[in-house]
Swiss-Prot record:
<keyword id="KW-1133">Transmembrane helix</keyword>
<dbReference type="Pfam" id="PF00033">
    <property type="entry name" value="Cytochrome_B"/>
</dbReference>
<feature type="transmembrane region" description="Helical">
    <location>
        <begin position="113"/>
        <end position="133"/>
    </location>
</feature>
<dbReference type="InterPro" id="IPR030689">
    <property type="entry name" value="Cytochrome_b"/>
</dbReference>
<feature type="transmembrane region" description="Helical">
    <location>
        <begin position="347"/>
        <end position="367"/>
    </location>
</feature>
<feature type="binding site" description="axial binding residue">
    <location>
        <position position="196"/>
    </location>
    <ligand>
        <name>heme b b566</name>
    </ligand>
</feature>
<dbReference type="InterPro" id="IPR005798">
    <property type="entry name" value="Cyt_b/b6_C"/>
</dbReference>
<dbReference type="GO" id="GO:0045275">
    <property type="term" value="C:respiratory chain complex III"/>
</dbReference>
<dbReference type="GO" id="GO:0046872">
    <property type="term" value="F:metal ion binding"/>
</dbReference>
<comment type="function">
    <text>Component of the ubiquinol-cytochrome c reductase complex (complex III or cytochrome b-c1 complex) that is part of the mitochondrial respiratory chain. The b-c1 complex mediates electron transfer from ubiquinol to cytochrome c. Contributes to the generation of a proton gradient across the mitochondrial membrane that is then used for ATP synthesis.</text>
</comment>
<keyword id="KW-0813">Transport</keyword>
<dbReference type="InterPro" id="IPR048260">
    <property type="entry name" value="Cytochrome_b_C_euk/bac"/>
</dbReference>
<feature type="binding site" description="axial binding residue">
    <location>
        <position position="97"/>
    </location>
    <ligand>
        <name>heme b b566</name>
    </ligand>
</feature>
<feature type="transmembrane region" description="Helical">
    <location>
        <begin position="288"/>
        <end position="308"/>
    </location>
</feature>
<keyword id="KW-0999">Mitochondrion inner membrane</keyword>
<dbReference type="GO" id="GO:0008121">
    <property type="term" value="F:ubiquinol-cytochrome-c reductase activity"/>
</dbReference>
<keyword id="KW-0249">Electron transport</keyword>
Length: 381
């Protein structure tokens, strides 16, 4: 058995990735979210596949087909709500995974980090298109509002929007292509995850101290396989609690009304996991400026390695930067809250202040704190 595991071309790759992989001996539970994201992706692909067997991507039947899945298909309600709430669990794990990377300086693995950012954008695009498919009110108007943002691009904007729509409004062509892309993208994401892991295994994992751990490695199996398994059990417990007891708690009631192009909902808003970016978008009273701020709010992650000024890798021994990091987390929670509120006083002002704070903390305060901490520890250049 050992010989097969270590010599067989396929089994060898699996062995070097998940069994005999040398891992740092001190990585905490914050390192569990990579495997949890893998589990989320598998759940989403499987439930999505079964949903696609019954779903029809036509404007006249899409809403009814989702109702049919919930009412008439064996365990259709379970599959549908696992898929919808699975997306929420996916984003919770994503945000915690990225936050871990920021806190412990994992962004110094440049290739792994940059592929991770591309993955984040791709997952966000996939989730957005998936939200359009049930063809409820919020699906339709969400698609209309978000795709319309591209019209802010000078010269080609309007043409580009109509090209994406496949007509002069969000209609049959839009729904069909969104379904096609929503079905295809998870497989592209899977391929990118493999590349993400490939680059990670070139360097090995980071650890909470940020210090090189080559002198103290342990095999991935059984130590981290059992630890990941515990994480998976907790994730599935949380997901199934959500699915079986509070399936609609994270959804919008407006999406239980079939799409009507003649009636606009009072408050158009995306799913909770996009609210922070939506708040940043709305805080700028200019269409193009808002779109640029929206993209910058995620793309700013690509600047993290450049903005790193500290002589230490992570924040474990850097109290000033730690404080700023947790202020940033609180700031993102405020943005998430504001994104779900109507555009009126005092929410507009709070949103603008939180948006300014978000960029200021990342671009100015954290690099400055790094320099101050270097001087406090009397590091010499």
């Amino acid at each position: 058995m050992t010989n097969i595991r270590k010599n067989h071309p396929l089994x060898k790759i699996m062995n070097e990735s998940f069994i005999d992989l040398p891992a740092p001996s001190n990585i905490s539970s914050w390192w569990n979210f990579g495997s949890l994201l893998g589990v989320c992706l598998v759940i989403q692909i499987l439930t999505g596949l079964f949903l696609a067997m019954h779903y029809t991507s036509d404007t006249s039947t899409a809403f009814s087909s989702v109702t049919h899945i919930c009412r008439d298909v064996n365990y259709g309600w379970l599959i549908r709500y696992m898929h919808a709430n699975g997306a929420s669990m996916f984003f919770i794990c994503l945000f915690l995974h990225v936050g871990r990377g920021m806190y412990y300086g994992s962004y110094t693995f440049m290739e792994t980090w940059n592929i991770g950012i591309i993955l984040l954008f791709t997952v966000m695009a996939t989730a957005f298109m998936g939200y359009v498919l049930p063809w409820g009110q919020m699906s339709f108007w969400g698609a209309t509002v978000i795709t319309n943002l591209l019209s802010a691009i000078p010269y080609i904007g309007t043409t580009l929007v109509e090209w994406i729509w496949g007509g002069f409004s969000v209609d049959k062509a839009t729904l069909t292509r969104f379904f096609a892309f929503h079905f295809m993208l998870p497989f592209i994401i899977t391929a990118m995850v493999v590349v993400h892991l490939l680059f990670l295994h070139e360097t090995g994992s980071n650890n909470p101290t940020g210090i090189d751990s080559d002198s103290d490695k342990i095999p991935f199996h059984p130590y981290y396989t059992i630890k990941d398994f515990l994480g998976i059990i907790l994730l599935l417990t949380a997901l199934m609690t959500l699915v079986l007891f509070f399936p609609d708690i994270l959804g919008d009631p407006d999406n239980y009304t079939p799409a009507n192009p003649l009636s606009t909902p009072a408050h158009i808003k995306p799913e909770w996991y996009f609210l922070f970016a939506y708040a940043i978008l709305r805080s700028i009273p200019n269409k193009l400026g808002g779109v640029l701020a929206l993209i910058a709010s995620i793309l700013i992650l690509a600047l993290m390695p450049t903005l790193h000024t500290s002589k230490q890798r992570g924040l474990m021994f850097r109290p000033i930067s730690q404080t700023l990091f947790w202020i940033l987390v609180a700031n993102l929670l405020i943005l998430t809250w504001i994104g779900g509120q109507p555009v009126e006083y005092p929410f507009i002002t709070i949103g603008q202040l939180a948006s300014i704070s978000y960029f200021t903390i990342i671009l100015i305060l954290m690099p400055t704190a790094g320099i101050i901490e270097n001087n406090m520890l009397k590091f010499t250049h």
